[in-house]
A protein has these predicted regions:
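N-terminal assembly/interaction segments in proteins that build large macromolecular machines
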Residues: 2-196
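A short, hydrophobic C-terminal helix/tail in secreted or cell-surface proteins
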Residues: 197-201
Length: 201
């Protein structure tokens, strides 16, 4: 059957798949969008399975807080090109938003969250099939405190910090502390008095 450009474009917006993949899926599904989406999903799963033994050493790392609950998450891929892709970064952000909203404590909980027409894990697998690269959620940590602050360095997708305080802290000061930690990468924080006492013996 003939497939219109409007339908192809619509399916592409729904799935993120390439134009030709969308056209072929719609043709095979005889114009049924649900069936076409399932065809694209299965193709993505097959592509992801073939790449399961590859190394995913690049990716996107982002952090977010609700005030007393903060999360940092990493979605990994194979190349920096994909890591910098807007759709890949958006997927990471969307997963992070879901994890924070549901206050997930483990990565398994995150992967099982509903997302789109499936789960978070399904969405990652689908994106893997679209890009042709191995992708995996590989890092996840939560921090809780009376007050937490996060810092995403220049909104880039690699350098983030989370700082938790045992009482309310002025937001500007908290951000400055988080930025200094990102810049200096300290192994610990001690008071000036303690440091001077250690230096003088």
């Amino acid at each position: 059957m003939a497939v219109s450009m409007a339908d192809i474009t619509k399916l592409r917006k729904m799935t993120g798949a390439g134009m030709m993949d969308c056209k072929n899926a719609l043709t095979e599904a005889e114009g049924d969008f649900d069936k076409a989406m399932e065809i694209i999903r299965k193709k993505g799963q097959a592509v992801a399975a073939k790449r399961s033994d590859r190394e995913a050493s690049e990716g996107c790392v982002l952090a977010k807080t609700t005030g007393d609950f903060a999360v940092i998450i990493a979605l990994k891929c194979e190349t920096d090109f994909v890591a910098q892709n807007a759709d890949f970064v958006k997927l990471t952000q969307d997963i992070l938003d879901l994890a924070v909203a549901n206050k997930c404590k483990t990565l398994d909980e995150v992967k099982a969250l509903p997302m789109g027409n499936g789960t978070v894990q399904d969405a990652v697998t689908d994106r893997s099939g679209i890009t042709g690269e191995k992708m995996e959620l590989d890092g996840y940590m939560t921090v809780e405190g009376a007050s937490t602050v996060v810092y995403n360095h220049m909104n880039r997708n690699g350098l983030c910090t989370i700082v938790a305080f045992n009482k309310a802290v002025e937001e500007g000061l908290a951000k400055q502390i988080a930025m200094q930690i990102a810049a200096m990468n300290p192994i610990a924080a001690v008071s000036y008095t303690h440091l001077r006492a250690h230096e003088t013996g």
